[in-house]
Amino acid sequence: RHARAGVVALRRPGSGGDTFEVTMPSDHAHVLGVVVQADGTDAEAAIEAALAAAPAWAALPFDQKAAIFLRAADLIAGPYRATMNAATMLGQGKTVQQAEIDSACELVDFLRYNVAYAQQIMSDQPDNAPGVWNRMEYRPLEGFVYAITPFNFTAIAGNLPAAPALMGKVVLWKPSPKAQFSAQGVMGLFT
């Protein structure tokens, strides 16, 4: 419940009024969608929503956060694989093979590796001397992470905001205007 509230709080379309068309790189007459540009008011609202969601998201046990990212990986690897590949092909002009590597295989790997490596990092603890107990605890940074992602790599665009979110940080994600089609697909898997 907290995770969904946090993600939904941040998934806000712009209300600034300015719009731009998302087109296929190989055919600019083929419009894939129209995006409403965020303005300063939208940015402030997103920051406020992120900061309001931060305590609940940080308090959510790691295993519950990890389950969200592992579920997204399973969805991308399974029933949403073709949709993610198609969005990457249409929006970024990639071939079938390039899209399969980028939006399916690598994004799934990133999400799963992030969980595995985070579990490993958190399980490593400093040595203890007799009569002394040392313990390392991980907690999120203060504030929020602002993730600006590239136009040409769906896997990196999905991973850049996912990694700090897995570790308990709230993230504002600004995907490239040229990658809105696949970014919408990635965000949809988390909501």
Question: What spans do the regions from the language model cover?
Answer:
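Hydrophobic face of amphipathic alpha-helices that form TPR/SEL1-like repeat modules
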Residues: R1-V34
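Short coil/turn segments at secondary-structure boundaries
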Residues: A3-G16, L60-F69, T83-M89, A99-S103, ...
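Active-site proximal loops enriched in glycine and acidic residues that flank catalytic Cys/His/Asp
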Residues: M24-S26, V35-D39, A86, Q92, ...
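Residue-level signal for inorganic ion chemistry
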Residues: A29, A50, K65, T88, ...
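Long amphipathic alpha-helix in the N-terminal Rossmann-like dinucleotide-binding domain
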Residues: Q37, T41-L51, P55-A56, A66-A82, ...
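Alpha-helical scaffold segments in soluble metabolic enzymes
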Residues: R71, A87, F110-Y113, G185, ...
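Rossmann-like NAD(P) dinucleotide-binding subdomain of oxidoreductase/dehydrogenase enzymes
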Residues: M89, A118-T191
